[in-house]
């Protein structure tokens, strides 16, 4: 999925929009930020504010903003667009929300309730944070070996370690807890300091100002990894 996201972020241009200009489009993002985000770094690319402004300008030039309440009628209209954002990251409130208000645009935000108010960290974000800390050690061989032992996998080199680690399934939560302990990272304190996700108050403020929120599953765990009962 990360590869698909990276491709989508790279190909935004008037040339590509020309190919789909006679239909509604729903560009989607996760985050807009100008600095490095450890919880995102190893997952996918993301755009800065300047590029996001350019995207809005490009879309507004070729399309008409689609009000959310008119989305059911969208199939009958041409050249409309509606922005969507996944995962409920904090930058939705601190960066994206002000820009959309400035431009007079609406949007839909799909969130995972388990992470609202920074109660805990999303599994894939935990993996990226851990890799970022391991990177600080210049991928020390001793640390890599300990992590591989805890998570029960073997690797050839630094590259294969990263690939395997990022593909660990969410059932490995307990092992990932141990890696946090190994690296001496207090996850609760990290969340309190970084505040990776939206709060209920921020969501309410945005809703009061005409923005829409939808569900993106409770915890974003891959459904194919869950039993029918867990789903």
Predicted regions and their residues:
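Catalytic alpha-helical scaffold of carbohydrate-active enzymes acting on polysaccharides/glycoconjugates
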Residues: 1-231
């Amino acid at each position: 999925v990360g590869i698909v996201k990276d491709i989508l972020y790279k190909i935004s241009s008037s040339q590509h929009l020309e190919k789909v200009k006679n239909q509604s489009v729903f560009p989607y993002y996760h985050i807009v930020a100008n600095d490095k985000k450890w919880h995102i770094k190893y997952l996918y690319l993301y755009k800065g504010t300047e590029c996001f402004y350019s995207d809005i300008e490009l879309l507004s030039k070729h399309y008409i903003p689609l009000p959310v309440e008119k989305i059911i009628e969208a199939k009958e209209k041409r050249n409309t667009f509606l922005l969507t954002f996944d995962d409920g990251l904090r930058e939705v409130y601190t960066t994206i929300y002000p820009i959309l208000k400035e431009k007079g645009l609406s949007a839909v935000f799909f969130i995972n309730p388990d992470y609202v108010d920074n109660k805990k960290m999303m599994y894939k974000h935990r993996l990226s944070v851990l890799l970022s800390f391991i990177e600080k050690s210049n991928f020390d061989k001793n640390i890599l070996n300990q992590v591989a032992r805890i998570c029960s996998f073997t690797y050839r080199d630094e590259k294969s370690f990263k690939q395997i680690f990022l593909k660990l399934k969410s059932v490995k939560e307990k092992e990932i807890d141990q890696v946090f302990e190994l690296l001496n990272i207090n996850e609760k304190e990290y969340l309190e300091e970084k505040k990776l996700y939206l709060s209920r108050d921020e969501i309410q403020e945005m809703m009061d100002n005409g923005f829409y929120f939808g569900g993106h599953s409770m915890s974003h765990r891959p459904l194919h990894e869950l039993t029918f009962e867990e789903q």
